[in-house]
Amino acid sequence: AARALLAAGVGHGERIAQLTTPRPEFMVLYAAAARIGAIWLGLNPRARYDELGYIVGDSRPRILFSIAEFEGRDYGDDVSRLFSESESAEQLVMMAPEARTPAISFEEFLAGGAKIDAATYEKACARARPGDAALIVYTSGSTGQPKGALLSQGGIVRTCLEQCRHWWAEPFRIIINVPVNHIGGAVQGATQALVAGGTNVLMERFDPAAIPGVIE
């Protein structure tokens, strides 16, 4: 996936935006972006169009990724409009078996990584540093629109190491059923399990009836 990002023109310090629930593609792109020193930004599937439009316009991602549907909401028209109105996005990728123009499927996106040779890939990875931003989290302020907060690779890892000192368990497994566009899902969930060498259990939505079975 990191090679596919490079093939699509994503460089060091540039952003990608992903409208997603907790699912494997989130983990893949989040890690791939960090690998080459790019920045991952999550978009909340429950956000209104105007909220999504503001964040995409403010963060200026090079690629827009999106699920096709969640809880009865079809995102096809909304993300196509986001893409057409964006001044920065050069590619729209739908995480679905099929994608209609102007989008391509996630599989097509990944296939593009074959264009990047080993030397180019290794050079891009070598540029990544602990101080590089890895994640943008939009958080409400006391006035005006939400503000984008930059979290560095090193800062995220150090936070997770400290959490592991206090919240250790064997085996180390974390259920992620919260939005991944914020700290709880992306850092305290996804990254902490990776840092600990543990396992992420992804649930697209919180379901009280299903939780006991998942825990067992």
Whereabouts are the PLM-identified features?
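Short beta->alpha connector loops at strand-helix junctions that form conserved
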Residues: 43-45, 67-68, 204
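Conserved AMP-binding/adenylate-forming
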Residues: 2-50, 57, 179
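Conserved S/T- and glycine-rich ATP-binding loop of Class I adenylate-forming
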Residues: 16, 33, 64, 133, ...
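Conserved adenylate-forming
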Residues: 49, 57-58, 62, 75-108, ...
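Conserved G/P- and acidic residue-centered "switch" motifs that form tight phosphate/ATP-binding loops
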Residues: 37, 142, 197
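Conserved AMP-binding/adenylation subdomain of ANL enzymes
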Residues: 157-173, 181-216
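Residue-level detector of anion-binding/catalytic polar loops
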Residues: 39, 62, 199
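Conserved pre-ATP/AMP-binding loop-to-beta segment of ANL
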Residues: 94, 104, 113-138, 145, ...
